[in-house]
Amino acid sequence: MMTLRDLINKLLGRETASANTARERLQLVLAHDRVDMSSLTTDLLDKMRKEILDVVAKYVEIDFEEVAVSLETEDRMTALVANLPIKRTISGEIKFKKNDKTDQADKDIKK
């Protein structure tokens, strides 16, 4: 039976904590249904983690003890999140290649 307080809360759009919890759980279930999470086994995630670290380690020195790779779900989207603390770059600094348009713009500015 709905109490007067429940009716007022419903009319004003207020929700109970359990309703919020239920909604969050449902969103998580829906997100997992949309992405075939069963194909992302622990072995596959470990392999992805190693390959990502191998590529990044070619360019920068990583603090491997602090590396964190996880799957996070928010707003019906699952993301692979990698936190890779960088100690320093391998060559001392990272140099970015400029494309022709950027080079021309730099020359125009210097004139």
Swiss-Prot record:
Pfam families: MinE. Keywords: Cell cycle, Cell division. The keyword Cell division applies. GO terms for biological process: cell division; regulation of division septum assembly. InterPro entries: MinE, MinE_sf. It comes from the Bacteria. Belongs to the MinE family. NCBIfam families: minE, PRK00296.1. Prevents the cell division inhibition by proteins MinC and MinD at internal division sites while permitting inhibition at polar sites. This ensures cell division at the proper site by restricting the formation of a division septum at the midpoint of the long axis of the cell. HAMAP family: MinE. This is Cell division topological specificity factor. The lineage of its organism: Bacteria, Bacillati, Cyanobacteriota, Cyanophyceae, Synechococcales. The gene is minE.
